[in-house]
Amino acid sequence: VLEQALENRSVGTGLFVPPGDSILLVNRFGQRFVNEHRNYNDRSRSHATFDPNRVEFPNEFQFMVYDQRIVETVGEQNGQPPIKPAESYVISGKTLSDLAQNIAARVEALAPRLGGYELDKSFAQNLKDTVQRFNEYAVAGHDADFGRGELPYDNAWQQLWALPTYTETHPANPHPNLSLHPLAAGGPYYAIILA
């Protein structure tokens, strides 16, 4: 969690694998770039992906986007830093547009400590498009971009560390791929910056 690391260079634990099923990672362009449930040794390498055409590391800082379902079903029971909205490093928005705007404001506030890092101008629109595409994959049960849920590890993590507590409001995932669940049609939505 970037903001924990900025406050204390020695954090108790990192966010090894995004917990839950209605959760995704986007880069500075608002686009997915990895199977979020890959093991942390493989997924963490995505931070260092270099784009020689743009001469940048587009995934250096990653935005973990999730919905209220994740807050209520996984919450603090994930063996990692808490993802509840009360945490100072959690960014929230009533809509995806609000969330994108609030992420941009947070990045702008942190930019002096991030070497002038900024979001691409396409971030807000791409975030909406990315969530829509992710939701379509979740309903279909197949992640055509990154194959999330096709490997045993993709589902094993949440069964060990992010064991959800389902409720009447947020029942068990009824979709064919247990590692994918559509983000809610309405907010609130949340994000945490990962480094």
What name fits each language-model region?
Residues V1-A195:
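Mobile, glycine/GP-rich and aromatic-enriched active-site lid/loop segments adjacent to catalytic centers
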